[in-house]
Amino acid sequence: MNVLDKYQTFYFAGIGGIGMSNLARYFHASGKNVLGYDKTETKLTKELVAEGISITFEDDIHKNIADLNPDNTLVVYTPAIKNLKILNYFNENNFQILKRAKVLGLITEHTECIAVAGTHGKTTTSTLIAHLCNVAGLPFSCFLGGISENFKSNFLYKGNQYSVVEADEYDRSFLQLSPDWAIITSDDADHLDIYGDAETIRQGFQDFANLIPENRQLFVRKGTHLNRPCMTYAVNSPADFYSDELRIENGKMYFSFHHEGKSTPFSWEIP
């Protein structure tokens, strides 16, 4: 049983964030009561309100908070939100409080999770995978780190068998996930305020890669520093999957795609 199932209400402190809002949309789509706080009204918070999610913009204990029951309410927060009266209230009244990364991890425990990690390219790659899942008619949910041009949202709900998630390396959040398949687009030095140096961030990606079950698959950009079996991809360089002969004509990109000694011509309008 998913431990999240016992909660009927989900309160998001910092609901206007791109990662918090897709979780809020997920629980709302699942029929839960969802409400939250954010400091500033934005286009995204207006969209959430239009979808039926209650949001306040004052750090105060309104009636909708005072009426919540700690036995069936989960409070979700992001470390970006600090020193809130609302969070202090929830702490003092014995509410269960979890970081956003932990909650996403609990969701992935009960789905077949496709996770996209890397210091660059997570949102684009995740959106492409979500598009393919959608076209294939798979029962999936996707949690994106940006607003997808084709979905007009950072979230899409088509079912719960599969999940497509961005595996965020910041604060080692991706180690909370339970990925079945994963792509690592890069392991360049980033977030050195958290990791300290390039070697430590690479170890973080190694720890993430080690979460993939041996009977599932990990795909990595060729040249990524990992010590485990994986399949590689590249552009203009031989790999397990690679493309070459790239050209752009009349707004379309043309290229040859290579795998297992076979070459297939491709074209698409994505830049």
Locate the predicted segments by residue.
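NAD(P)-binding Rossmann-fold cofactor-contacting core
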Residues: 31-47, 140
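Structural motif
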Residues: 9, 73-74, 181
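A short glycine-threonine-serine/GTX helix/turn-capping micro-motif
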Residues: 172, 265-271
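Conserved N-terminal Rossmann-fold NAD(P)-binding element of oxidoreductases
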Residues: 10-15
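Phosphate-binding loop of NTP-binding sites
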Residues: 3, 26-29, 49, 62-70, ...
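Positively charged, low-complexity intrinsically disordered leader regions
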Residues: 1-7
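N-terminal Rossmann-fold NAD(P) dinucleotide-binding loop
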Residues: 20
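Conserved SAM-binding strand-loop segment of SAM-dependent methyltransferases
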Residues: 54-58
